[in-house]
Amino acid sequence: MHFAGKLAKLVNMSILPTLVVATALSLSSPDFSSNGMIPAKFTCEGASTSPAIHIGNLPAQTKSVAIIVHDPDAPMAGGFTHWVAFNIDPAADIPAAFKGGVQAMNGAGKPGYTGPCPPTGVHHYHFMVYALDTRLGLDGKAGKAELEKAMQGHILAQGDLVGLYKKSK
């Protein structure tokens, strides 16, 4: 059976309408390259402000953007979350030292971004950005788990930009 026939069979079996596939956002930063070292000014050895993130392929129907920055290498169960923010107005750029949207609870129990500060060795920091089809009804007391649950079924596209950091001292 050729491709069109197989596709028609899938549609007739009602399988296709249940598939939900988010497209990929293209993420970059003017401050560090993908899998490159994050400059100290964005860490505990500097001002601990968030780096700028450029978002490519943002779907036109995006109503809000969310970001989670997570270090899976942190020496604690589940890693450490450095930033949780959501209800960010959709735009191609999140500027450095960004304070917009709802700045929610990071792994330290504080709102907003806290820079990388690994105890030893090189850690990987995942800057995960989500394009959503809605604004979320959460407040700033939400953390990573609450945001992930609220985003279910609303992700239009997502991307992951990884930066590395190792303390100099």
Segments (PLM) and residue ranges:
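N-terminus-centered regions that define maturation/targeting leaders and the start
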Residues: 22-169
